[in-house]
Curated annotation (Swiss-Prot):
It comes from Klebsiella pneumoniae (strain 342). GO terms for cellular component: plasma membrane. The active site is at residues 201, 254. Its EC number is 3.4.21.105. The chain crosses the membrane at residues 94-114, 142-162, 169-189, 192-212, 229-249, 252-272. It comes from the Bacteria. This is Rhomboid protease GlpG.
Amino acid sequence: MLMITSFANPRVAQAFVDYMATQGIILTIQQHAQSDVWLADESQAGRVRAELARFLENPADPRYLAASWQSGQTNSGLRYQRFPFFATLRHNAGPFTWAILLICIAVFILQNLLGDQPVMIWLAWPYDPSLQFEAWRYFSHAFMHFSLMHILFNLLWWWYLGGAVEKRIGSGKLVVITVISALLSGFVQHQFSGPWFGGLSGVVYALMGYVWLRGERDPQSGIYLQRGLILFSLVWLIAGWFDVFGMAIANGAHVAGLATGLAMAFVDTLHGRKRA
């Protein structure tokens, strides 16, 4: 038996299983934290993964619904657990995801109580040679946010992408991505604008790049980002460079973060691709 992928939504998993049945390939679903899709005949793995890639591009394609009707199992009999809102938040994120999220919220509250400047004096990228050995500064800039929209946007993506990485690959991988991308995106942004910047967006862009490329090159990892969302992130990135929104955007951090995530995903999947 070979696990092909996992879906957070059991109905989506059932749609893919039904479609593959019409193609003569039998898959089974095992319900754990997510809906795990398993293949008994491992010789068919290549074909299944190719079909999975097409399915993930457009799960709403009518052919998949038609397959469910053809199989006579649009009502599959699965029981779907209903999660309250906060239980859903907990379910889809691990301890490191939550730790960073709560730190960002705490820092944002302090910024609103004390003002940005006192907080930046303690957390900003080293702005004086005497501060270069205060190691936390190379990462703590990511905890600061300067508007409600800024923090909501970043934390939503952090929870969605960081939670997926931590749940499917492990806390260690998320820690490594976060530390490296915060350091490199901060360094690049410092070269562009000096030390007075902040936000988790460099890390978020790293996660976008990592999750997308890891999912493309290693579908069995269980993480993926729809191509439409990675396209949206690129459009947002380009718009930031041309100041379309009229806001101060850390473009250097965004580009460096995205490049870091792509590079890490490439390295992490290189061995498996060579072996294949």
